[in-house]
């Protein structure tokens, strides 16, 4: 049965999850195998070696592609990797020495690290700009620009980038526009429908949703780009195991339900923080006062589960606060059902200290989970009082 054209929630449950034809099992099995029997030399049933392909991985790739707008049987598709950084690295490997890349100044620290500390050494030319300013983005694009890398909302400052405008600027220079859609997920934002050429995810985060699996993915409708990335996936071999794929596929089934709860709770938390005298600044696109609010309202279905803020007492107050929460767990990562709190400057973004992508030392980042919002607000209230 084709689920093309059905709503997001239906496709999240059913695409890539057909009942097993051999047994009738409603949930597709985990194909925990490294190799596949061949009928004769050069003749097999679609799989030969698990680095090249595995049915469980295919199921997940098909599902994620559908959710991002590339239906089964259409040009392009989805590819899964052992981590979000493996997916990012694969995209950068499509570039050649001398090519130029434009990267957001507010970006995941690992993305900056691999671009600036690894690929620049191999001949990549890199410009880091504030992409919330379209003028600055356009000024950074050169004749040799081949990739414009967008994060929106950005990590960790929750800036909002105009995807359609960024894609148009990239295409005018003959460049590819890639969007890291990890924070928003395809439930809230569909970059391909706004003109982007490629979407990247850390599926560790909201797609998996339970903090129990590490993975990455990319989706593109462009056949040539898909085939190049597929070659690199197989050649470099940074692929997820079947158990990781199965766990992620299980998580995706409840993505819509979880994202609604994340968004609702994040709005409650952000509004609470905005009214507290101990808080100097709150960044959340859902607040009408946020500089990215109007744009986010146009290109997102809701505003996501991430909140950032700066305590009025500076970095020492921030350190005391993150150590004082009881419901929020002090930990890196994001997107799980449980609420997390961290200091990006010393944790997830420590690698960008002293660079153009450095984040404020007193910034606190929240991954707001699906607990009861009253408990989350109460926890932050007591932590602010103790800090």
Where are these regions (language model features)?
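N-terminal "arm"/small-domain region of PLP-dependent enzymes with the aminotransferase-like
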Residues: 1-54, 60-63
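Conserved PLP-enzyme active-site core in the AAT-like
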Residues: 2, 14, 67, 73-278
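Glycine-rich beta-alpha junction loops
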Residues: 17-19, 32-37, 183, 205, ...
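PLP-dependent enzyme catalytic core of the Aspartate aminotransferase-like
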Residues: 72, 116, 125, 139, ...
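A common structural junction motif
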Residues: 236-237, 324-333, 383-387
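Short, well-ordered beta-strand elements within core beta-sheets of diverse protein domains
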Residues: 248-257, 304-312, 364-369
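Conserved small-domain helix->loop->beta segment predominantly found in fold-type I
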Residues: 267-326, 330-335, 349-358
């Amino acid at each position: 049965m084709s689920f093309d054209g059905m709503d997001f929630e239906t496709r999240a449950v059913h695409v890539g999850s057909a009942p097993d034809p051999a047994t009738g099992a409603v949930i597709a099995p985990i194909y925990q195998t490294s190799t596949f029997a061949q009928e004769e030399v050069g003749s097999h049933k679609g799989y030969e070696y698990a680095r090249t392909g595995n049915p469980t991985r295919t199921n997940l790739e098909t599902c994620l592609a559908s959710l991002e707008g590339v239906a089964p049987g259409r040009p392009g598709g989805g590819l899964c990797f052992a981590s979000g950084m493996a997916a990012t690295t694969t995209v950068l490997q499509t570039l050649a020495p001398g090519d130029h890349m434009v990267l957001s100044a507010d970006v995941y620290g690992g993305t900056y690290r691999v671009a600036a500390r690894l690929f620049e050494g191999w001949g990549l030319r890199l410009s880091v700009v504030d992409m919330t300013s379209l003028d600055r983005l356009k000024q950074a694009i050169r004749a040799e620009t081949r990739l414009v890398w967008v994060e929106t909302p950005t990590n960790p400052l929750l800036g909002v980038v105009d995807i359609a405008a960024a894609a148009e600027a990239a295409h005018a220079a003959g460049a590819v526009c890639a969007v890291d859609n990890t924070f928003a997920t395809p439930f809230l934002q569909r970059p391909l429908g706004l003109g982007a050429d490629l979407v990247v995810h850390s599926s560790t985060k909201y797609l998996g949703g339970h903090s129990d699996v590490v993975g990455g993915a990319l989706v593109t409708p462009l056949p040539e780009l898909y085939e190049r990335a597929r070659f690199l996936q197989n050649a470099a071999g940074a692929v997820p195991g079947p158990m990781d794929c199965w766990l992620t596929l299980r998580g995706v089934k409840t993505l819509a339900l979880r994202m609604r709860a994340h968004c609702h709770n994040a709005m409650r938390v952000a509004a609470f923080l905005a009214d507290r005298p101990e808080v100097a600044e709150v960044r959340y696109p859902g607040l009408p006062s946020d500089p990215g609010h109007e744009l986010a309202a146009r290109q997102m279905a809701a505003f996501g589960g991430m909140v950032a803020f700066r305590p009025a007492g500076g970095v020492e107050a921030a350190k005391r606060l993150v150590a004082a929460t009881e419901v929020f767990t002090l930990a890196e990562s994001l997107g799980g059902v449980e609420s997390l709190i961290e200091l990006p400057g010393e944790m997830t973004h420590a690698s960008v200290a002293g660079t153009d992508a450095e984040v404020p030392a007193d910034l606190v980042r929240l991954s707001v989970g699906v607990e009861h919002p009253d408990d989350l607000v109460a926890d932050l209230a007591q932590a602010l009082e103790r800090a």
